[in-house]
């Protein structure tokens, strides 16, 4: 059947097609009763560098449908019903920055000869769009560990170049075929050049389409002006002051501009697959616009570099990352797309490559899925799996969600359950006895291990023992690392160590032995 308006319709200028359009009701089929094509499902990935401070990220207690958002999740608490928060993701004791970056979309750090999951999804959904996929970043290459700079890989396992300049992305989407930056000054606003066609289209459109078109043109105009302001501000900065790795004062503007462009590109069906790195996995950026004076990577090692000032600075950066995630979701929810919003017809993956940022623990990796995926995701849930899950299982589930024909991915042969139903095995702590036994200068404690949530003592671990105050663990970095205390947090353990007394309470100052009551020890599979 013919269409009233082709889905690939562009607003035209004297030079020809120029500006892609979002979905309009005019694009539905003419014949009454004819089935219209369903909305395309998009895939978007937002990568957060340098892991997290677990007590600020992790959800404590709660159930699948009844849970409280953690402190770091508060910026997007209003999106709770659009989120699927996954816990117990990742099954490695430790991980390097480079390996954790590779694993984020490739499932395993040894999966070096095949495409990352985003590219396999792009193969499935990207045909017929102007851009099969977009690979974007905030930070330049880190040459000392080049693998820290990439999450997207082609079919040969080679990294795909990223673009960091939102102005260039704007030109690709809205100023094609005039993509030469040197020509920008000679060009009118893209909206000025398509104004006559826009007026003509508006006259034939219904009320809802006119509202969508007005919103779209307004967003394009504001994005264009924002990019002009960024460019003007950049031209005013003396080159001698631009010393890497300082983040530019307008980084927030640049990132929000890129998120605007991502939303527009998805909304206009210019692409259906985007990856965006908020920084390299070992990001050295200094967020001076937040009042932070140290490198992000240095601050992420909050155990060995502990001070309350450093931890507060780290949490400022992590909170900023979450605010940008909130910004993206808010944008996507505001754009009408068929019978719903752009977010309703998208799957957005947010996360990092490692859990505990200091110890590089590759368990309890922060992973959130957002959007309904056209009904493919069941959101408003917190899913904590009974056992640690390989990221490859998540990727395989995503591939099947997008009808990509894969029986395995990155050493995983079964898809992760629980993404669109409650058919998964949730974490339930087995019953155990907690107790304390003391000897000559030693103590053995059995109980649940956790990190202190008091930010003034972020180096302190606690073992909860029924009927008495928790036993404190205050040890040097060597014990923290060698016994991988971060790996065991949230689970029952038995610890023997040297003990001293402080303020009338026992404090373990050196760990001699650690046994997990129910889980496996880390270290046999490091990556």
Where does each model-flagged region fall?
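Ligand-binding pockets and gating/stacking loops
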Residues: 1-434
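Short, glycine/small-residue-enriched coil/turn segments at secondary-structure junctions
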Residues: 433-443, 490
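Structural detector for short beta-strands of small beta-barrel domains
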Residues: 440-457
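OB-fold and OB-like beta-barrel modules that bind single-stranded nucleic acids
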Residues: 445-449, 490-498
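OB-fold (S1/OB) nucleic-acid-binding surfaces
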Residues: 456-475
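Short nucleic-acid-contacting surface segments enriched for D/E, G, S/T with interspersed K/R
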Residues: 479-494
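OB-fold/S1-family single-stranded nucleic acid-binding modules
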Residues: 502-523
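Short, solvent-exposed mixed-charge patches
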Residues: 525-527
């Amino acid at each position: 059947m013919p269409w009233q308006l082709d889905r690939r319709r562009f607003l035209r200028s004297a030079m020809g097609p120029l500006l892609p359009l979002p979905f309009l009701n005019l694009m539905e089929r003419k014949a009454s009763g004819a089935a219209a094509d369903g909305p395309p499902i998009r895939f978007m990935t937002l990568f957060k560098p340098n892991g997290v401070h677990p007590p600020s990220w992790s959800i404590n207690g709660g159930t699948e449908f009844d849970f409280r958002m953690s402190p770091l999740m508060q910026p997007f608490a209003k999106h709770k019903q659009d989120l699927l928060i996954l816990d117990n993701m990742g099954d490695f004791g430790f991980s390097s920055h480079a390996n954790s970056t590779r694993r984020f979309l490739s499932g395993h750090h040894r999966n070096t000869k095949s495409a990352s999951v985003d590219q396999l999804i792009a193969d499935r959904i990207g045909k017929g769009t102007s851009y099969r996929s977009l690979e974007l970043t905030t930070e330049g290459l880190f040459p000392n560990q080049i693998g820290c700079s990439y999450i997207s890989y082609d079919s040969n396992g080679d990294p795909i170049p990223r673009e960091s300049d939102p102005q260039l992305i704007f030109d690709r989407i809205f100023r094609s075929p005039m993509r030469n930056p040197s020509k920008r000054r000679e060009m009118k606003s893209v909206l000025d050049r398509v104004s006559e066609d826009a007026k003509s289209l508006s006259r034939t459109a219904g009320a809802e389409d006119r509202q969508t078109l007005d919103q779209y043109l307004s967003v394009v105009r504001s994005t264009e002006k924002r990019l002009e302001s960024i460019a003007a501000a950049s031209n005013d900065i003396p080159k001698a002051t631009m010393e890497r790795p300082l983040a530019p004062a307008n980084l927030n503007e640049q990132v929000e501009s890129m998120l605007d462009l991502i939303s527009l590109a998805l909304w206009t069906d210019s692409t259906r697959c985007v990856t965006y790195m908020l920084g390299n996995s070992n990001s050295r950026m200094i967020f001076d616009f937040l009042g932070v004076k140290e490198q992000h990577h240095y601050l992420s090692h909050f155990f060995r570099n502990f001070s309350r000032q450093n931890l507060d600075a780290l949490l400022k950066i992590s909170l900023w990352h979450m605010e940008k995630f909130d910004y993206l979701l808010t944008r996507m929810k505001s754009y009408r797309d068929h019978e719903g919003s752009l977010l309703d017809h998208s799957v957005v993956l947010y996360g990092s490559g490692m859990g505990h940022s200091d110890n590089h623990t590759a368990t309890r990796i922060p992973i959130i899925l957002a959007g309904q995926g056209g009904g493919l995701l069941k959101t408003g849930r917190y899913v904590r799996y009974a056992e640690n899950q390989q990221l490859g299982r998540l990727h395989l589930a995503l591939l099947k969600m997008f009808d990509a024909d894969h029986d395995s991915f990155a050493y995983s042969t079964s898809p992760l359950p629980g993404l669109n139903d409650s058919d998964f095995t949730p974490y339930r702590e087995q019953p155990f006895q907690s107790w304390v036994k003391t000897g000559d200068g030693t103590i053995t404690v059995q109980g649940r291990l956790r990190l202190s949530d008091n930010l003034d003592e972020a180096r302190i671990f606690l073992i909860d023992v029924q009927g008495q105050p928790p036993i404190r663990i205050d040890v040097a970095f060597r014990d923290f690392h060698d016994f991988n205390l971060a790996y065991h947090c949230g689970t029952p353990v038995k610890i023997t160590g040297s003990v001293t007394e402080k303020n009338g309470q026992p404090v373990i100052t050196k760990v001699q032995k650690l046994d997990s009551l129910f889980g496996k020890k880390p270290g046999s599979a490091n990556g």
